[in-house]
């Protein structure tokens, strides 16, 4: 019998970034009959608007909290060097596109490294396209696919699936056995 462990995340979720070392340990110790499936959560819809100063301060404070509580480090230059947007759907779409080429984990890692360590903005198309190229995806095809109705539909389907799991916080883990779903408490 195959079990499914759903990992519900957003590639631009700072708590998901902090959870990465724990998730990697979980994957090492999982039985071979448990398949891990990533589901993007979609924290924030497409937007070109600059994030309000209040929201910027709130998110940067979350980064400080994570540094203090968990020890994960962030490059706070992001808040000085970038024009932050409250928009993660583009990063979610990039993750799905990378999945189609078996590069999902590389894309998640590239997005998180760019955002949290290199102070780059994954809500900008130029950044996302350069990350696709960096992990070996065809730049032109990726850019074209990023604009397609198919990726928009695929993202909406994944967000609807996430909602059907009643997940409202990221990261989340849910184990599926037969038709039953079992939420798993997250520990860092």
Model-derived features with residue positions:
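Structural alpha/beta surface segment adjacent to cysteine/selenocysteine redox centers
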Residues: 20-118
């Amino acid at each position: 019998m195959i079990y499914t462990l759903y990992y519900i995340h957003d590639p631009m979720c700072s708590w998901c970034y902090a959870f990465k070392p724990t998730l990697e340990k979980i994957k090492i110790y999982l039985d071979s009959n448990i398949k891990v499936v990533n589901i993007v959560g979609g924290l924030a819809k497409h937007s070109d608007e600059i994030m309000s100063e209040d929201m910027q301060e709130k998110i940067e404070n979350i980064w400080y909290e994570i540094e203090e509580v968990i020890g994960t480090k962030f490059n706070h230059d992001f808040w000085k060097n970038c024009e932050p947007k409250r928009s993660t759907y583009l990063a979610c779409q990039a993750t799905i596109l990378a999945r189609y080429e078996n590069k999902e984990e590389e894309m998640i890692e590239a997005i998180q490294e760019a955002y949290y360590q290199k102070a780059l903005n994954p809500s900008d198309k130029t950044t996302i396209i350069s990350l696709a190229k960096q992990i070996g995806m065809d730049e032109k095809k990726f850019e074209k696919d990023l604009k397609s109705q198919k990726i928009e539909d695929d993202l909406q389907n994944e967000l609807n699936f996430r909602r059907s799991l009643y997940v409202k916080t990221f990261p989340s883990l849910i184990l599926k056995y037969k038709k039953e779903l079992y939420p798993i408490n997250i520990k860092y």
